[in-house]
From Swiss-Prot:
Entry protein name: Ribosomal large subunit pseudouridine synthase C
Cellular-component GO terms for this entry: cytosol
Functional description taken from the UniProt entry: Responsible for synthesis of pseudouridine from uracil at positions 955, 2504 and 2580 in 23S ribosomal RNA.
Catalyzed reactions per annotation: uridine(955/2504/2580) in 23S rRNA = pseudouridine(955/2504/2580) in 23S rRNA
Provenance organism: Escherichia coli (strain K12)
Consequence of gene loss (knockout): No visible growth phenotype. An rluC deletion suppresses a bipA deletion; in a double rluC-bipA deletion the cold-sensitive growth and ribosome assembly defects at 20 degrees Celsius due to bipA are fully suppressed and decreased capsule synthesis is partially suppressed.
Pfam families, per database record: PseudoU_synth_2 (PF00849), S4 (PF01479)
Transmembrane spans: none
Keywords, comma-separated and alphabetical: Isomerase, RNA-binding, rRNA processing
Family: Belongs to the pseudouridine synthase RluA family.
Length: 319
């Protein structure tokens, strides 16, 4: 990247970035800037490609030089990251794998993947603060805020396209570990129940089993049994919102400390057993996919945090 002045950026378009519209490209370069402002600077001719004015639908070509004017990000957006510097630094400790194409991390429970909806900080905002030199960082998939484990981030548009294609074609395998109520029957290896999203009057999003919903399937395997709970491995075949949480509830075995689909009596039992658990026991343990750059089949595992390990050890000791 060349710099024309301390505040104006000149960006040379790479082959990986070619083919996208200039308005979409600017949205990746000007994080936190409203779309209305991006279209305004395009209309006013403040953005130039090869020193010429362009329209928002202009498609970039490799070798194009894009002039990006200084744009002041809203102060509240800038200030949002500063109280979370400790969280940003902590993200560096949970990176499981990184190369020029992808970054994989072990997302902590309680951290959203994206800021928004009243949250000023998310994993992707933290990674952008941690990797300010990265021109592209986008989530390949999502994890619920309270779910921990493997989270895949693309560092190139071509990588994101390849990995999204794998998701669409079911070429990516995700394995989760969940602690559920009661004794999961070994013969129940799959739950197939259509899921429908609902928005409550409070604005809360909830998912229910409904014949009007989308076809959904999760495969299950018993990993370990305890006196009043079971650790199961969950492999979603489809990727619906809250799928594992709703399918375990539908099967009669809700997940521990699930504030939306769980069972308060089960949570109380775990507390009285001295497990120390106070979070959703759902962990994305492994992710298998084809590397978008090398074609190598990769399987990346994320260890459980100490709180989940202590909980399981307590349950083992109580058997």
């Amino acid at each position: 990247m060349k710099t024309e002045t301390p505040s104006v950026k000149i960006v040379a378009i790479t082959a990986d970035e070619a083919g996208q519209r200039i308005d979409n490209f600017l949205r990746t370069q000007l994080k936190g800037v409203p779309k209305s402002m991006i279209y305004r600077i395009l209309r006013k001719g403040e953005v130039r490609v090869n020193k010429k004015r362009i329209k928002p639908e202009y498609k970039l070509e490799a070798g194009d030089e894009v002039r990006i004017p200084p744009v002041r990000v809203a102060e509240r957006e800038e200030e949002a990251v500063s109280p979370h510097l400790q969280k940003v630094a902590a993200l560096a400790d949970v990176i499981l794998y990184e190369d020029d194409h992808i970054l994989v991390l072990n997302k902590p429970s309680g951290t959203a993947v994206h800021g928004g909806s009243g949250l000023s900080f998310g994993v992707i905002e933290g990674l952008r603060a941690l990797r300010p030199e990265a021109r592209f960082l986008e989530l390949v998939h999502r994890l619920d805020r309270d779910t921990s484990g493997v989270l895949l981030v693309a560092k190139k548009r071509s990588a994101l396209r390849s990995l999204h294609e794998q998701l669409r074609e079911k070429g990516m395998q995700k394995d989760y570990l969940a602690l559920v109520r009661g004794q999961w029957q070994s013969h129940v290896k799959s739950v197939q129940a259509p899921l429908l999203k609902n928005i409550l009057q409070s604005g809360e999003r909830i998912v229910r089993v409904s014949q009007e919903g989308k076809p959904s399937e999760t495969r299950f395997k018993v990993e370990e049994r305890y006196a009043f709970a079971t650790l199961v491995r969950c492999s979603p075949v489809t990727g619906r919102t809250h799928q594992i949480r709703v399918h375990t509830q539908y099967a009669g075995h809700p997940i521990a400390f699930d504030d939306r689909y769980g069972d308060r009596e089960f949570d109380r039992q775990l507390t009285e057993a001295g497990t120390g658990l106070n979070r959703l026991f759902l962990h994305a343990a492994a992710l298998k996919f084809t590397h978008p750059g090398t074609g190598e089949v990769m399987r990346i595992e994320a260890p459980m945090d100490e709180g989940l390990k202590r909980c399981l050890q307590k349950l083992r000791n109580a058997r």
